[in-house]
């Protein structure tokens, strides 16, 4: 896997270490009689999966709640990427066990489900260690949730971690328009799952399975539904998204990620496209050209490299060298000069010497990153790296991580400060923190706040950057030169294209 940890603006490695924990919840409609609480950890794929689980259960009478104590069904949608992932889940289950006992005593039975990659990896062990769990379901079989919940009503303690032959996407239900609108103007769309790379530090091939790609028509249908309910930006996601290899029934030919994005970009009403996460080895010429040729494709790319040492890259089974990555970056920047880059780094991989670590720092200096995620290597059971005898001392790993993060933070702040005084096209997404304020995202995924009318939510507007804080910008809304937006947020495709072409010409220092 390439390192599925993309996030708009990584506030710190500590926030990244928190695994983007997201608790989903909304006000219950009166027509529903049961309440659902979903807590999702990890990558964007888990956010997408959590939404699909809620959509599957809505016809069963479940409405989401933000309070676990109000729930009839609690789902922990877990991630297995980081250190001690399973133990964190068991710690959370300990709290839920007490909650379940309290609710049971009050005459309100509660079901607990463990889903996601920890469920896939641990399986029966979860039931053995925590008797309060009713169901364990893997990421490739959660489309069976309604049926499985009916079964656990009579036989608690079920495990379904199979990799079924049928495509789970054929069984997922489309969300209701009001639910899409509630989730905002941006949405994730899974186009690819699994990974065939087998990096020696990574569990994803074992928990998510082999690479599979959805058909083009199914993806376009999902995006069309999202656009109709107000979505203006989609992020195409996959564990190794640029390995996408679908089929396009319109052309009768195989489809790449680049050709898929061209189809998506042509859909009326959609303003922006992003994709994540990518592996350098699958960054083909057509995908690089897409950054030049598709105005709606944002100039931000998360492309994990993990290390700057050829020796460590070989030990990680990355199948590329540091020089290959640097050449790739040069080609991408030649195609899209204003592109901002993000990456993942692992320090303290077994066998890493001080010289290997210095090579990583040198690569960072040479590339210049707008943002990045960085981690100490942690042994993942069942992966080749975990069995190596040359493990690095924890103190050494901590020291190296601190040095690396200091350099990355310096680059991030320099990138953000370079935006002050510039005019950026901002997609406004929601009301801001204060009255009269609206919040949005720049093309580079930074959060931005400006004084403006809520009618502008769902539109792209030019904003002058006034201040650059550690994690967000403050800007001044400018009058559009391409015509007025409607209150519904419909924007002319021509105006958007001109704005993004102008943005493309800006030199972005790092």
From Swiss-Prot:
Annotated GO CC locations: cytosol
Chain sites annotated for binding [4Fe-4S] cluster 1: 43, 79, 117
GO molecular-function term, one example from the UniProt record: metal ion binding
Pfam families linked to this entry: Radical_SAM (PF04055), TRAM (PF01938), UPF0004 (PF00919)
Matching SUPFAM superfamilies: Radical SAM enzymes
UniProt cofactor note: Binds 2 [4Fe-4S] clusters. One cluster is coordinated with 3 cysteines and an exchangeable S-adenosyl-L-methionine.
Region of interest (Disordered), residue spans: 1-25, 484-510
Catalytic activities: N(6)-dimethylallyladenosine(37) in tRNA + (sulfur carrier)-SH + AH2 + 2 S-adenosyl-L-methionine = 2-methylsulfanyl-N(6)-dimethylallyladenosine(37) in tRNA + (sulfur carrier)-H + 5'-deoxyadenosine + L-methionine + A + S-adenosyl-L-homocysteine + 2 H(+)
Keywords tagged on the record: 4Fe-4S, Cytoplasm, Iron, Iron-sulfur, Metal-binding, S-adenosyl-L-methionine, Transferase, tRNA processing
InterPro entries attached to this UniProt entry: Elp3/MiaA/NifB-like_rSAM, Methylthiotransferase, Methylthiotransferase_CS, Methylthiotransferase_N, Methylthiotransferase_N_sf, MiaB_methiolase, rSAM, rSAM_horseshoe
PROSITE patterns noted in UniProt: MTTASE_N (PS51449), MTTASE_RADICAL (PS01278), RADICAL_SAM (PS51918), TRAM (PS50926)
TRAM domain sequence ranges: 417-479
EC numbers: 2.8.4.3
Residues in MTTase N-terminal domain copies: 34-154
Composition skew (Polar residues), residue ranges: 484-493
Necessary cofactors: [4Fe-4S] cluster
Physiological role: Catalyzes the methylthiolation of N6-(dimethylallyl)adenosine (i(6)A), leading to the formation of 2-methylthio-N6-(dimethylallyl)adenosine (ms(2)i(6)A) at position 37 in tRNAs that read codons beginning with uridine.
Stated family: Belongs to the methylthiotransferase family. MiaB subfamily.
Subunit record text: Monomer.
Protein name in UniProt: tRNA-2-methylthio-N(6)-dimethylallyladenosine synthase
Species name: Beijerinckia indica subsp. indica (strain ATCC 9039 / DSM 1715 / NCIMB 8712)
Lineage of the species this protein comes from: Bacteria, Pseudomonadati, Pseudomonadota, Alphaproteobacteria, Hyphomicrobiales
Gene (name only): miaB
């Amino acid at each position: 896997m390439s390192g599925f940890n993309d996030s708009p603006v990584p506030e710190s490695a500590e926030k990244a270490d928190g695994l983007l924990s997201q608790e989903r919840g909304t006000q219950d409609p009166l027509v529903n009689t049961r309440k659902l609480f979903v807590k999702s950890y990890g990558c964007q794929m888990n956010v997408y999966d959590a939404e699909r689980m809620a959509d599957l259960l809505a016809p069963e009478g479940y409405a989401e709640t933000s309070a676990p104590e109000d729930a009839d069904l609690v789902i922990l949608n877990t991630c297995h990427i980081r250190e001690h992932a399973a133990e964190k889940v068991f710690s959370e289950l300990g709290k839920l066990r007490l909650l379940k006992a309290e609710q049971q005593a009050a005459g309100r039975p509660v079901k607990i489900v463990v889903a996601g990659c920890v469920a896939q990896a641990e399986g029966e062990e979860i039931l053995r260690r925590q008797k309060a769990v009713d169901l364990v379901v893997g990421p490739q079989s959660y489309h069976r949730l309604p049926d499985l919940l009916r079964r656990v009503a009579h036989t608690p303690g079920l495990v379904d971690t199979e990799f079924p032959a049928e495509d789970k996407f054929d069984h997922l239900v489309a969300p209701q328009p009001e639910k899409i609108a509630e989730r905002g103007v941006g949405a994730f769309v899974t186009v690819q799952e699994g990974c065939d790379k087998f990096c020696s530090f990574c569990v994803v091939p074992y928990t998510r399975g082999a690479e599979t790609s959805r058909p083009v028509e199914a993806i376009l249908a999902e995006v069309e539904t999202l656009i109709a309910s107000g979505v203006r930006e989609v992020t195409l996601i996959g564990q190794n998204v640029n390995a996408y290899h679908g089929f396009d029934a319109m052309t009768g030919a195989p489809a790449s990620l680049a050709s898929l994005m061209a189809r998506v970009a042509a859909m009326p009403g959609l303003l922006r496209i992003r994709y994540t996460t990518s592996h350098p080895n699958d960054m083909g010429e057509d995908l690089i050209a897409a950054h030049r040729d598709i105005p709606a494709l944002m100039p931000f790319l998360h492309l994990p490299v993990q290390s700057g040492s050829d020796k460590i890259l070989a030990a990680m089974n990355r199948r590329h060298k540091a020089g290959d990555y640097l050449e790739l970056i040069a080609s991408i920047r030649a195609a899209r000069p204003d592109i901002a880059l993000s990456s993942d780094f692992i320090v303290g991989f077994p066998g890493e010497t001080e010289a290997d670590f210095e090579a990583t720092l040198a690569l960072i200096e040479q590339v210049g990153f707008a943002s990045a995620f960085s981690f100490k290597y942690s042994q993942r059971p069942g992966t080749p790296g975990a069995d190596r005898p040359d493990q690095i001392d924890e103190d050494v790993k901590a020291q190296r991580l601190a040095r690396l993060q200091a350099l990355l933070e310096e680059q991030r702040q320099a990138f953000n400060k370079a935006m002050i005084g510039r005019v950026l096209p901002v997609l406004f997404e929601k009301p801001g923190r204060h009255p009269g304020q609206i919040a949005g995202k720049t093309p580079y995924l930074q959060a931005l706040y400006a004084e403006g009318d809520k009618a502008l939510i769902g539109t792209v507007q030019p904003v002058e950057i006034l201040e650059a804080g550690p994690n967000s910008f403050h800007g001044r809304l400018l009058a559009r030169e391409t015509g007025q937006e409607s209150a519904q947020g419909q924007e002319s495709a021509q105006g958007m294209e001109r704005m993004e072409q102008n943005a493309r010409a800006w030199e972005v220092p790092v």
